[in-house]
Each structure stands twice: as structure tokens, then as C-alpha cells.
Curated annotation (Swiss-Prot):
PANTHER family: HYDROGENASE-2 SMALL CHAIN, NIFE / NIFESE HYDROGENASE SMALL SUBUNIT FAMILY MEMBER. [4Fe-4S] cluster 2 binds at H234, C237, C262, C268. The lineage of its organism: Bacteria, Pseudomonadati, Thermodesulfobacteriota, Desulfovibrionia, Desulfovibrionales. [3Fe-4S] cluster binds at C277, C295, C298. Belongs to the [NiFe]/[NiFeSe] hydrogenase small subunit family. Its main location: periplasm. [4Fe-4S] cluster 1 binds at C67, C70, C164, C197. One of its GO terms (cellular component) is [Ni-Fe] hydrogenase complex. This is Periplasmic [NiFe] hydrogenase small subunit. The keyword Glycoprotein does not apply. It holds the Pfam family Oxidored_q6. It comes from Solidesulfovibrio fructosivorans (Desulfovibrio fructosivorans). Heterodimer of a large and a small subunit. Residues 1-49 form the signal peptide.
Length: 314
């Protein structure tokens, strides 16, 4: 897989077809991204244009203290597959999980990308350990915070994918022995935060498209694009009518839960969580609450501490 050259519209569409993705599916995905951005169906061609442009910007994707779940969520999306849609149409010059290079060759690729004359956009996955000069988190013999600081200094823009890079994530949970922090807090830089554990790839793709077509989106006080994180999960939940009728499931295996009764008394954090999960779903198929699991509030800062216990006795 070639990550260094954008395919262009014709070649990109051929690649999609070869991977079993029809143009109809591709445009449907673009329409979903457009809708998530708060735009009408007429904006879908603009999304398609941004994703199949011949000359793509350089992207450096750093992994810090994390589980790689955000990458896994992104590369396992369907219709169209993210490798055919995104990874082949941007100049993804460094991404440890999927790049072919390893060891010194990988480090050389990172150095080359950071010194490129055309600049780059930085994607960060994972929190930053800060204690003892960041030595609790090392990659290639360098503290994660040192490498990220260097990359952030010249970046055209910084997108934090996942709650770990946005706010510190599970590494920051009490007692936080490594003094982990999110990128913005640790480095004092402005970031576009796409939180979630993992975040919906639609929100990540939408943020990328917005940056390429319209610039930095309007952000809330926590650095999240209001386009994707402007409404409470609760307000768009299909179980909301049952909440308003005070119809609560007494247990996860109850008939009431199967009938769609509200999961609030079982620990659902939808009433205090900003995200668009009920609207865009995961892989356009399902999302936790619809599947019978309470919202954990994973797109909120410090949710590992502030949203626990995740489950309550009904």
C-alpha cells in the first residue's frame, strides 16, 4: 500500500471498486460525513472532492500512551473501507501501526516528514506522561512528550484522536502515577479534539474534511468540534421517550431493557455526555445504548474518574 501519493479522483474510485466499494456506497459515506458536519446533502460532492484530491497534505500520526483502539476503530470501518478511502488518498508519512518501515527506517521517515518543505498536519493518539521529564513514556529512546512537542511546533494543525490525546484518558485516571496529560494541557497548544474511547471515525474524517475545505471548525470549551459534539447523547437517544415516561430498565437482561426502556438507572451517562453517537452510529449499524449498554461518557474529560461507577444497580 502506497502512503506517499494521493490517488486522485479517477484512481481513487478505481481503487474503491477493486475493494468492493461502489461509488454509491462512497457517496453515501460522504453524505454521512456531510450530515455529521451539519451540512446538507449538497455538500457530499465537496467531501468526495476533499477525499479524492490528487495532491494530498502530509500527515504525521504519533502514538503515545494509548491502546491503539482509535487506530483500530478507524481502519476497521466499512463502506468504504478506510484504507481505500483515507489512507491511500493522503500522504500518511508516519503511522507506527500500519507503516511498513520499522526501527531506524521508521525514525528516518518521521524525521523526513517533519522536515518536509510543504509542511504537515499532526494527528496524535494517546496521552503524554510528564513526570521525570516524560521518561515514563518513551519511543525510540525519546520521551513521547519531547517528540510530540517537536512535531507540534511546525504542524499546520493538530488533531487529537481519542480521549487519551485529547484529555489524558485512562493514563490520567487517579492516582495518575505518570502525571499523564492531554496534548493541549501538556504542551499549551491549540488542538482539535475528537474524543471517544474510541471515537467514531465519522467524526475524525469529518474533522479532516472540515480542515481541508473550511479550516478549523468551531470548537467548544473542551476543544471539540461543535458540529459533532454540540448535543447531549441523551437528547437524541431512541430510549428518550421511556426516560420522559419514567420507564427504566431494572436490569440489563430484563424484558424492559429488551423493549428499549431507559438505561439511566443502570448507570447511563447520556444526560451529561456530548457526542453524536445516536445520529451517526458505528459503521452505520449500531451504537452502545441501542445495543443495550449504557453510555460511559467516554467523550468527556476525565471520564474514568468523573463517570465512575459505570454501572449502577437498578
Amino acid at each position: 500500500m502506497n502512503f506517499s501519493v494521493g490517488l486522485g479522483r479517477d484512481d481513487a474510485e478505481k481503487r474503491l471498486v477493486q475493494n468492493g466499494v461502489s461509488r454509491r456506497d462512497f457517496m453515501k459515506f460522504c453524505a454521512t460525513v456531510a450530515a455529521a458536519m451539519g451540512m446538507g446533502p449538497a455538500f457530499a460532492p465537496k467531501v468526495a472532492e476533499a477525499l479524492t484530491a490528487k495532491h494530498r497534505p502530509s500527515v504525521v500520526w504519533l502514538h503515545n500512551a494509548e491502546c491503539t483502539g482509535c487506530t483500530e476503530a478507524a481502519i476497521r470501518t466499512i463502506k468504504p473501507y478506510i484504507d481505500a478511502l483515507i489512507l491511500d488518498t493522503i500522504s500518511l508519512d508516519y503511522q507506527e501501526t500500519i507503516m511498513a518501515a520499522a526501527g531506524e527506517a521508521a525514525e528516518a521517515a518521521l524525521h523526513q516528514a517533519l522536515e518536509g518543505k510543504d509542511g504537515y498536519y499532526l494527528v496524535v493518539e494517546g496521552g503524554l506522561p510528564t513526570i521525570d521529564g516524560g521518561q515514563w513514556g518513551m519511543v525510540a529512546g525519546h520521551p513521547m512528550i519531547e517528540t510530540t512537542k517537536k512535531a507540534a511546533a511546525k504542524a499546520k494543525g493538530i488533531i487529537c484522536i481519542g480521549t487519551c490525546s485529547a484529555y489524558g484518558g485512562v493514563q490520567k485516571a487517579k492516582p495518575n502515577p505518570s502525571q499523564a496529560k492531554g496534548v493541549s494541557e501538556a504542551l499549551g497548544v491549540k488542538t482539535i479534539n475528537i474524543p471517544g474511547c474510541p471515537p467514531n471515525p465519522i467524526n475524525f474524517v469529518g474533522a479532516v474534511v472540515h480542515v481541508l475545505t473550511k479550516g478549523i471548525p468551531d470548537l467548544d470549551e473542551n476543544g471539540r468540534p461543535k458540529l459533532f459534539y454540540g448535543e447531549l447523547v441523551h437528547d437524541n437517544c431512541p430510549r428518550l421517550p421511556h426516560f420522559e415516561a419514567s420507564e427504566f430498565a431494572p436490569s440489563f437482561d430484563s424484558e424492559e431493557a429488551k423493549k428499549g426502556f431507559c438505561l439511566y438507572e443502570l448507570g447511563c451517562k447520556g444526560p451529561v455526555t456530548y457526542n453524536n453517537c445516536p445520529k451517526v452510529l458505528f459503521n452505520q449499524v449500531n451504537w452502545p445504548v441501542q445495543a443495550g449498554h449504557p453510555c460511559l461518557g467516554c467523550s468527556e474529560p476525565d471520564f474514568w474518574d468523573t463517570m465512575t461507577p459505570f454501572y449502577e444497580q437498578g
